[in-house]
Amino acid sequence: ELLFSEHHQRHAASAFYPSPYNNAAVLILDAVGEWNASSIHVGQDSKLTPLYEGKFPHSLGMLYSAVTNYIGFKVNSGEYKLMGLAPYGEPKYKSLILDKLLDIKLLVTKQVIEKV
């Protein structure tokens, strides 16, 4: 029998099932997998339940790729270099980025909070 699953469902499963926890919240942040860019799942015993899906183009992963490109690395292959260099940087442009570039809001509904 051939089974199909969604991209974020596979991410959540690969994080939850091998973990030592019987109950856990699983947060997935991706560039884009099918159309989801983020998702929240709750793992309880042997079951994963999706609670939230953030859709493309609202993606922290795509933003990370854009920054990777802006500093001169190749998208979809240079992100690890940016990640490796991150601890050596200074937050020189932090205020500019937060004030002028990003509008980050935490999107957690009452339903998600109650289930977790």
Please place each PLM-identified region on the residue numbering.
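Short acidic/glycine-rich loops and adjacent helix/strand connectors
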Residues: E1-V116
